Amino acid sequence: MLRRAVLLMLFLAPFLLGPVGSAKALFESRDDRLGAIRSIGIIVAVGDQFTFAKSGLGTDRSSRSIGIGEWGVDEAIAKQVGELVGRRFQVTPVTWSRSAFFADSGTSPGFSMFRGDRFAKRVQSEVQPQGLDAYIVITKARVDLGAGGRKVDGLGLITFRTLMETYTALHAFYEIRVIDGRSFDVIEEMTAGPLAADLRKNLRLAGPARLYEGSVTAVTDAGDAGLHRAILDLIAQSLPMTLESMHLR
């Protein structure tokens, strides 16, 4: 029985550790691995689209999206993250294939036992320069909308309709990975959680969100300055808490 268990672990080890994983990852703690990082690159693939969705009684379950590349959301996130982690790490500018990362961003699941983490593979093949100690990768997260298996991701507005009221929530669902720049193991990963204010308002969304008082029907393109400011402010409030929880500050 013991021999079978040992053989099973030896068979599964390459899949559990990833294609380039090593026994080192088994014995080093997350803090040890983060502590060894000096140079770091920041990759962001969140702000290509903004989605409008509805949920609740008698609502149309279809959604619509607008392109928001001109808002510079990814650039704003990269700048803020660089400032927050730059006190601890040497932030090195990197370039990457935006289309490649957006193709995977917001899809689920992120990890396959047999193929490893898809974003770790993207870092290995689509990012320059290679050879940094680690890369911070920020992408869209998917969260449940209600109990029917429906999901939403990234940036957007959700209009909720109940028997008593109708209200709209602005959301910014994202996740952060820290990927080893040599082994391409995922050192740490986290999906951003709700802000304290979200919990008090009982928005029931598993990520950063807040009530939105502006007009939703009037938004037809990316020219809405108020919505632009609101989403950047929501992300700016969430990032410090998320990075702190990941021990990156």
Question: Where are these predicted regions, by residue range?
Answer:
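Positively charged n-region of N-terminal signal peptides that target proteins for export
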Residues: 1-4
